[in-house]
Amino acid sequence: RGYELGIMHERLRVLPFGNGKWIMRHRIDAYAANSFSASGNGHLISTMLDYSYGQLYTYRFPCGLVWRTGGEIELSGGVLYNPRNSNNPAAAKTSIVLGFAEMLTYTLHIGRFPIPFRYQLSLPVLGAFFSPAFGESYYEIFYLKNHSGIVKFGSWHNRFDMNNLLTV
């Protein structure tokens, strides 16, 4: 149980090459969450900031459907805070991933009013993640220089993540 508040900003722009068929997309997501365990004795607070940049190629179909497909790079960072954890009450989360980006757009006209429908899919494929060992303190990582194994490789075999967005 809990709640999450977030805001997203996205900017699309046609690139100067490719006869208007290539677009670039900048997306920034910021959110904060506060969650509690079902028994009420666990509590987790998190904040995250994500930025992604992608380039997408545009296909236009005679029926009015527009399909954009391409790749993107995403940078993420944030903090998890667990008040019950005495060793590391706050944990940093960072990642960088490369993936696919898809977008389907269709505009429905009701009278004079256009109603655009858009579905977006982001599917990370390869990435690197900051992931300390369980129970490893930041004192051990940064002061004692125990850096081995804190950056992990990620792909579909150990971190499947798919972001979907539907807008009307």
Regions found by a protein language model. Give the residues of each.
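Extracellular loop and loop/strand-boundary signature of outer-membrane beta-barrel proteins
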Residues: 1, 34-43, 85-91, 151-156
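Residues on the lipid-exposed face of transmembrane beta-strands in outer-membrane beta-barrel proteins
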Residues: 7-17, 49-57, 100-108, 119, ...
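Transmembrane beta-strands of outer-membrane beta-barrel pores
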Residues: 30-36, 73-81, 121-129
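Membrane-embedded beta-strand positions of outer-membrane beta-barrel proteins
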Residues: 24-28, 69-73, 117-121
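Residues that define the transmembrane beta-barrel architecture of outer-membrane proteins
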Residues: 3-7, 22, 43-51, 65, ...
